[in-house]
């Protein structure tokens, strides 16, 4: 409320938060990263109910088209002098000057669990086999997801040759027909085993939605409750659709569940929303 009072005339406006961050950036000359602690949704006026909009999130002006609409915290990092509207145009887009992250907690307990999880992670030593990298890839689409994963793995091997690689490609595992849909219990088991044994990073390329990776449901948000406690929490990178969505007042995405789960899941995610 203090930020809204000083930079937004008392109104809960995302520009008030952005302008406060910009002031700190330009006056202090030291600000490099900002972490937002609290859920944000597209329900600015709190008309729909559901989860609270604790720290609002930027929503694109084209908010009704399912292919062009998006929400993003990047807006808070656009702090150049004279910058007003976000043009939302790749050809003339503004530059992020600081890193922006968000912990979409909706309660004190969730925030506390995340903090304890992070402190425990930072105290851990980087040891093998935990210091391995895992590459998870979908099938279909003429093998493009596997090819992309191979490119990522090659780049990491060149830059960091001391890491061991684990490649979990869906085409390697048997699929079965269940009720007219394809599933792969073998691939699902392989993912859980790899995460349980420890991996520093998990990189996924393929199809997905808010709660699931792959049409074969190899990773689902609802499975997380059955995962064992993990000794090494991975950083997740997911090149897919909506897995990291966190602007809904009703649905909690798999990325949110992974981040806020106690003693399991993910230490952080770079995901698409």
What residue ranges belong to the model's regions?
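Cysteine-dependent hydrolase recognition
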Residues: 1-273
